From Swiss-Prot:
Region entry Disordered, spans: 110-142
Annotated source species: Helicobacter pylori (strain J99 / ATCC 700824) (Campylobacter pylori J99)
Protein name: Small ribosomal subunit protein bS6
Gene3D superfamilies: 3.30.70.60
Annotated NCBIfam families: S6
Length: 142
């Protein structure tokens, strides 16, 4: 299975129940095709960068998932035929570096510290600890 991110924007004229049903529909499309949704972000109603189909706002939803490549065509087809979807994008993460970035995005969405950030914080702590030791040694030698 490959790593993917999808984002879609729904029309702002939909009521809350319709928005929830659209989101659930696309989540089910992923899971019915043996995909695994790692995490998702319900970003809510936001201003669009530019007008799309006479709408200045849209409802944003992002999902990070693992799935077989064959399923992506079906997901994109379903986005295209739904008139309530203003825009969509599906991003595939292929290389090792991209997959690591995908994991970092998933961790951030789940509010977990990323692995790279933890390593950086440990290194930073060690450097600041050594700097404090050096200062205390200097003050004792005077």
């Amino acid at each position: 299975m490959r790593h993917y991110e999808t984002m879609f924007i729904l029309k702002p004229t939909l009521v809350e129940e319709e928005i929830k049903s659209k989101i659930e529909f696309y989540r089910e499309v992923i899971t019915k095709h043996h995909g695994v949704i790692e995490t998702s972000l319900d970003m809510g109603m936001r201003n669009l960068a530019y007008e799309i189909k006479k709408h200045k706002r849209g409802y944003y939803y992002v999902a990070y998932f693992k799935a077989d490549p064959s399923m992506i065509l079906e997901l994109e087809r379903l986005y295209r035929i739904n008139e309530d979807v203003l825009r969509f994008i599906v991003i595939k993460y292929e290389s090792k570096k991209e997959v690591e970035a995908w994991h970092a995005l998933v961790d951030r969405a789940n509010k977990k510290p990323s692995h790279a950030k933890e390593k950086h914080e440990k290194t930073e702590h060690t450097h600041s600890h050594h700097a404090e030791e050096a200062k205390s040694t200097e003050s004792h030698s005077e």
